[in-house]
């Protein structure tokens, strides 16, 4: 589960994951923390 600061971050993360990128990459890119 990703812990993003806001909806924008969550959308960013989901889009990134949809493009088959690693969780770590997406969380860093979108300012999210992996919990």
From Swiss-Prot:
Annotated localization: Secreted
GO cellular component: extracellular region
Keywords: Antibiotic, Antimicrobial, Cytolysis, Disulfide bond, Fungicide, Plant defense, Secreted, Toxin
Paired cysteines (S-S): 4-32, 12-30, 16-26
Gene3D superfamilies documented for this protein: Thionin-like
Keyword set includes Disulfide bond: yes
Post-translational modification: Contains 4 disulfide bonds.
Tree of life domain: Eukaryota
GO biological process terms held by the UniProt record: defense response to fungus; defense response to Gram-positive bacterium; symbiont-mediated cytolysis of host cell
Gene Ontology MF, one: toxin activity
Pfam families documented for this protein: Thionin
SUPFAM superfamilies: Crambin-like (SSF57429)
UniProt family annotation: Belongs to the plant thionin (TC 1.C.44) family. 4 C-C subfamily.
Functional description taken from the UniProt entry: Antimicrobial peptide disrupting membranes. Has antibacterial against Gram-positive bacteria S.aureus (MIC=6.5 uM) and B.subtilis (MIC=3.25 uM) but not against Gram-negative bacterium E.coli. Has antifungal activity against C.albicans (MIC=1.63 uM).
Protein name, as recorded: Thionin NsW1
Organism: Nigella sativa
Upper classification of the organism: Eukaryota, Viridiplantae, Streptophyta, Embryophyta, Tracheophyta
